[in-house]
A protein has these predicted regions:
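Conserved "HGTGT" condensation-loop signature of ketosynthase/thiolase-family condensing enzymes
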Residues: 1-101
Length: 101
């Protein structure tokens, strides 16, 4: 089965990690060579703990947050940041034609 050609547009970036939240925080820490590593809590293993995140900013319903595993909350939070970055959050006419990866 032949697949139709599709245009792909990257319109927003959502990133949260041990370096912080958003592209700017990441670039600043990467350029300054400021790793965020915890070498004591789970020694001898090095851990890069997630930066403090207010999940309420992207997942307003506490019930939704309670039903999610940590990885789901982080992914949903990052997706919300990407929608904010793209400027399409709260615009159903655009969101109804959009796929997220």
């Amino acid at each position: 089965m032949a697949e139709a050609a599709r245009d792909v547009w990257i319109t927003g970036i959502g990133i949260v990690s041990s370096l912080g939240e958003g592209p700017e925080a990441h670039w600043q820490k990467l350029m300054a060579a400021q790793p965020s590593a915890d070498t004591t809590t789970l020694a001898p293993f090095v851990v890069h703990p997630l930066a403090p995140v207010n999940f309420d900013a992207q997942i307003p319903k506490k019930g939704d947050q309670r039903q999610m595993e940590p990885w789901q909350r982080i992914g949903t939070y990052a997706a919300g940041l990407a929608l904010d970055s793209a400027g399409v959050k709260g615009k159903p006419d655009i969101l109804s034609h959009m796929d997220m990866i």
